[in-house]
A protein has these predicted regions:
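AMP-binding (ANL) adenylation modules
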Residues: 433-437
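N-terminal basic, amphipathic alpha-helical segments
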Residues: 1-130, 335, 339-346, 367, ...
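Conserved core segment of the aminotransferase class I/II
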Residues: 302-371
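Conserved core of the PLP fold type I
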Residues: 136-274, 286-303, 373, 463
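Short beta-strand "wing" residues that participate in macromolecule-binding interfaces
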Residues: 57-58, 167, 427
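Conserved PLP-dependent catalytic core of the aminotransferase class-I/II
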Residues: 354, 366-392
Length: 469
């Protein structure tokens, strides 16, 4: 055993024995080198090895810390079977009942689609918004119509460039949140009655858009760890005249899955070979827990077939409703559809976010947000282990703020939703994530709020209800 491996094993034993607990800082490189009589390079090699094994993680300018994720005691949810038919979509009534459930401020919002506002820099944004409103040039009503505020588009393009993706700001269109971007993309490439490949389970807003546009869904199974099943998608592309594919490639809602880079590249190539556009919903991309943001599928697009959609709603400012789309070869058509519907998003909101991106410390905010979300995930996973049946299967995503739970087979998540709501707890039942209303024994839980005694009590109550089935 090499010296760095021996030192790594010594630290690993301290973690396994509980001497170094989850979230606790491990000795600094300098301290470890002096205390244990090893060179700094040996310590670095040991820590790198422990990081690869998932036992510790580095925080920029803070050192190394014990990973909050112990090896998961849960099995992964089972991958759904492929449905070999297209289907019309009718889920809105069910979705609206879930959305209504989170309006009561006294309800524990495990069914919400947003993180807590407490996690966002709202006072700093408010100052930017007030300044933008005071200084707004009346001519911006004309000059900042679609494609949107030039400074904001420039800032977004710069963030992509830092991540290694050269995305010209001329391709970027600012929208009223990502949902409008996704609507516009579908309208640009489909007609009523067309077939669209979607994930199963899929974000319910995707299903509602298909329902509104009178499109049919072809459901493709999703693996809880690495995303959409490419073999199933390839079969569907051979069998059906699919006009578009809509997928979340990073930290998918509701499962939390992220396609590895090679799989994203394969997805783009598969769709390119059939000349089918990919609508990439990438709204959770900034909420990664590791050291590096996942690369979007758009990075592998060479023919302009990927329509990449993003938003600040999940990472910075939910109420501002500012999103964007880089629509590739469809950019002009999408922009014209935008001009025919809502002209442009709020100009003060665009200017405020542009100012914050330039001056407000967005990356510092994101580091704090990611850390908070990862800690909250650990708290919810621990609560599930304490209170839920042993056969519960749980996803464990490396970003975002959702867990997908597959409960014992006899559990009816629609009844569970009503029973939990009567106790002041909102959840998202599985059937709202499927065009065919499958996943009856599954639920999605949101851990995007600071963990409190009320959160813990709600999980205990929820676990007790699940056990009653």
């Amino acid at each position: 055993m090499k010296r760095y491996e021996k030192f790594a094993e010594d630290i690993a034993e301290l973690i396994r024995s509980g001497v170094l607990g989850p979230g606790q800082r491990v000795p600094s490189v300098r301290y470890a080198s002096q205390t244990y009589g090893v060179s700094p390079s040996t310590v670095f090699q040991a820590y790198y090895l422990l990081e690869r094994r998932g036992l510790i993680r580095a925080r920029p300018r803070s050192g190394y810390f014990v990973n909050t994720h112990a090896p998961s005691p849960f099995s992964e949810p089972v991958v759904s079977e492929q449905v070999h038919e297209s289907t019309e979509v009718d889920v809105s009534e069910l979705v609206f009942s879930v959305l209504d459930s989170i309006k009561d401020p006294n309800t524990v919002p495990f069914g919400s689609a947003f993180p807590s506002p407490m996690l966002f820099p709202l006072p700093r944004l408010a100052r930017s918004l007030a300044s933008a409103s005071r200084e707004m040039d009346p001519r911006l009503v004309v000059t900042d119509m679609s494609p949107g505020n030039p400074q904001l588009r420039r800032q977004i393009a710069l963030r992509y460039m830092v991540g290694g993706l050269m995305l010209p700001m001329e391709e970027l269109l600012i929208t009223n949140g990502a949902l409008e971007a996704l609507n516009l993309c579908l309208q640009a490439v489909t007609e009523p009655g067309d077939l669209v490949a979607i994930e199963a389970p899929a974000f319910y807003a995707c299903l509602q858009v298909l329902e509104r546009l009178k499109l049919k869904a072809v459901e493709i199974p999703v693996h809880p760890r690495d995303g959409i099943d490419l073999n199933a998608l390839a079969q569907a592309l051979e069998r059906y005249p699919i006009k578009a594919c809509w997928t979340m490639t990073s930290f998918q809602n509701p499962m939390g899955a992220t396609l590895p880079e090679a799989k994203k590249q394969a997805l783009v190539e598969l769709l390119r070979s059939h000349q089918v556009p990919l609508i990439e919903d990438d709204v959770y991309a900034e909420l990664y827990y590791g050291q590096q943001a996942p690369k979007p599928a758009k990075a592998f697009d060479t023919e302009g077939l990927v329509m990449h959609c993003g938003s600040f709603a999940k990472s910075l400012a939910p109420g501002y409703r500012v999103g964007w789309v880089a629509a590739g070869r469809y950019a002009q058509k999408v922009e014209r559809l935008k001009l025919m519907t809502s002209l442009c998003p709020s100009m003060p909101a665009q200017a405020a976010i542009a100012d914050y991106l330039q001056h407000g410390g967005y990356d510092r905010h994101l580091r704090k947000l990611r850390y908070a979300l990862e800690e909250q995930q650990s708290a919810m996973l621990a609560a599930i282990a304490r209170y839920f049946p042993a056969q519960t299967r749980v996803s464990q995503p490396a970003g975002g703020y959702f867990l997908w739970l597959e409960l014992p087979e006899q559990t009816d998540s629609l009844k569970l939703f009503q029973m939990a709501l009567a106790q002041g707890i909102s959840i998202a039942p599985g059937p709202i994530f499927s065009a065919t209303q499958r996943f009856r024994n599954c639920i999605r839980l949101n851990y995007g709020s600071p963990w409190t005694d009320a959160s813990e009590k709600a999980m205990e109550t929820l676990g007790r209800i699940v056990r009653s089935f």
